[in-house]
């Protein structure tokens, strides 16, 4: 697909603007995805407000965003499992594909992984992205593209629940009702935990936790 696309670019701390760039051409093993939704993560805000997270320092111009969902609009010649029109969620970590961990399906442990919106790798606050087809996951009909964009943070919550061996009949407390706290609460409920309580100091967040299924909430600023 030829043409230009709009890209939201971080031009400095607290400074955003738009650029026009060429729509990327997918390689044989890639698909071109027209992005419909990209979540705004806490790390995006941190980079925007401070210009760095630890040793990862933004060198403008830089593109933020790593929680994308969209529609396949072009398919590389080697891609067989996706077609134009498929709605997909994108894995934001790009891996080598041939190390022992990648071959075992544990590609999150790849020593050469690079991540959308982690300097120096640009993110996806843009209209299109070419991405490895094996890292694009087709969404079922009962999952919207908006929900697909939230699979990345949801996976963090499920990983926490799995690591904690959450199971039927347990009680659990989640400290913090930000995005990750809320999806962790939902993951605990999905794994059968009987009672999940959420602690925060912001009433609006606690209200959202109750709306999403918490069994109870505690305002840490008001209660011991």
Predicted regions and their residues:
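Adenosine-nucleotide cofactor-binding segment
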Residues: 174-177, 189-224
């Amino acid at each position: 697909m030829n043409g230009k696309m709009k890209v939201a670019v971080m031009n400095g701390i607290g400074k955003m603007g738009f650029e026009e760039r060429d729509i990327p051409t997918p390689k044989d093993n890639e698909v071109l995805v027209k992005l419909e939704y990209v979540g705004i993560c806490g790390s995006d805000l941190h980079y925007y407000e401070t210009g760095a997270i630890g040793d990862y320092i933004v060198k403008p111009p830089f593109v933020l965003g790593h929680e994308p969902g969209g529609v396949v609009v072009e398919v590389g010649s080697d891609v067989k499992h996706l077609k134009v029109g498929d709605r997909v969620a994108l894995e934001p970590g790009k891996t080598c594909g041939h190390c022992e961990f990648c071959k075992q399906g544990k590609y999150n442990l790849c020593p050469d992984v690079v991540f959308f919106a982690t300097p120096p790798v640009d993110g996806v606050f843009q209209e299109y992205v070419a991405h490895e087809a094996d890292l694009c996951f087709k969404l079922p009909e009962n999952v919207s593209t908006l929900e697909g964009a939230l699979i990345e943070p949801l996976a963090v919550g499920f990983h926490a629940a799995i690591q904690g061996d959450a199971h039927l009949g347990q009680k659990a407390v989640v400290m913090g009702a930000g995005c990750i706290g809320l999806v962790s609460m939902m993951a605990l409920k999905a794994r059968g935990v009987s009672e999940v309580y959420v602690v925060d100091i912001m009433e609006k967040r606690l209200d959202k936790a109750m709306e999403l299924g918490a069994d109870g909430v505690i305002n840490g600023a008001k209660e011991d």
